[in-house]
Amino acid sequence: MKVTQMYKNFLENEKAGGVVLIIATIVSLLVANSSIGHSYIGFWEMFVGGHTIEHYVNDGLMTIFFLLIGLELEREVYAGELSNFKKALLPIIAALGGMIVPACIHMFFNTGTPFQSGSGIPMATDIAFAVGILSLLGNKVPLSLKVFLTALAVIDDLGAIFTIAIFYSRGIDVMYLAGAAGIWAVLFILNRRNVNILWPYLLGGIVMWYFMLHSGVHATITGVILAFVIPFGKGDPDSISIKLQHWLHKPVAFIILPIFALANTCIIIDSDWSASLMSTNSIGIFLGLVVGKPLGITLFCAIAVWLGICSIPNDLKWMQVIGVACLGGIGFTMSIFITLLAFDDHAVISGSKIAIMLSSVTAALIGLLWLKMTLKEPLSNELTEEI
């Protein structure tokens, strides 16, 4: 069976988007530490209509990113790796290990400290960077390994979304939350009545986002719950869910995530930056992402296979699973996003961002080198195009 063109496009976009994301991060760091650094940071902190520009990026544009994540998850549930329960078990169990172990490592260092709210930071995986790094290895990578990493990262992001909704939502306003639930219920009814026109769902999503913004539950959650009421149908190219997913890939990869990186990596690296890396928070983040992620993913997979709960695909080797588990430690955008919700102190946020970037680069290099050693021979075109 041929791999769908959309899946190929997805991998290609993630690879190119990862490069753009890296460039945006480097540019942001360079400008922030230049002579115009304070003006640059001031731009993102400028108030427009009662909120900062950074706030609009994090609560507005990132909702579109989460909508795409939700649509990806919907596709996996209805027609992808998560559509078959036994096939879905391996990435689900892997993702659980990749969330629980890093969070426990951070908690070990920070329980009882002002940093304990940051335990959700090392739980996340940046799907754009992780898949982008894997794609650098070209046709040496078995398709099942790419699919495993994609499913793992999507489930990981879902776990991060639940973490945000449960632990980082403040001062719940029941009336606004009920309003958002009411809008969602109307959209669900439209879905069940086979209303296959996109604009009612997008319009309802905007209203729902407004209610969520004022409810105390983080507004970006709107993107995910909206995705699951947009009709998927049979998953054919005419499905409005598939069409929207296709339309969103390039804007998210090449506009929204780079803008997020520009807004949230404008960090002034002063003489005390190395001291911030010695804090228990930074140590917890670094060890959580670089050690906890691969340990948790690999350990949980090994236990599940040993118990006979699930099995790894025939064309995968354990050494390759370990390499992908290392790439799971690339937290970057998702980890930074949770950092902004976990802390209010600017110094702590800046220190966390530096730790996240250092951890993500380390995890990427380890994963890339590990896979380069374990993936020896390029696969033929026929093998890379067939499942």
From Swiss-Prot:
GO MF terms held by the record: sodium:proton antiporter activity
Its membrane topology: Multi-pass membrane protein
InterPro entries: Na/H_antiporter_dom_sf, NhaA
Signal peptide region: none
Keyword terms: Antiport, Cell inner membrane, Cell membrane, Ion transport, Membrane, Sodium, Sodium transport, Transmembrane, Transmembrane helix, Transport
Primary location class: membrane
GO biological process: regulation of pH
Catalytic activity: Na(+)(in) + 2 H(+)(out) = Na(+)(out) + 2 H(+)(in)
Cellular compartment(s): Cell inner membrane
Any one GO CC term of the record: plasma membrane
Keyword Kinase tagged: no
Transmembrane intervals: 16-36, 53-73, 89-109, 118-138, 147-167, 171-191, 197-217, 220-240, 251-271, 283-303, 321-341, 354-374
Cell membrane is among the record's keywords: yes
Function: Na(+)/H(+) antiporter that extrudes sodium in exchange for external protons.
UniProt record similarity statement: Belongs to the NhaA Na(+)/H(+) (TC 2.A.33) antiporter family.
Protein name listed in UniProt: Na(+)/H(+) antiporter NhaA
Organism: Cytophaga hutchinsonii (strain ATCC 33406 / DSM 1761 / CIP 103989 / NBRC 15051 / NCIMB 9469 / D465)
Highest classification ranks of the organism: Bacteria, Pseudomonadati, Bacteroidota, Cytophagia, Cytophagales
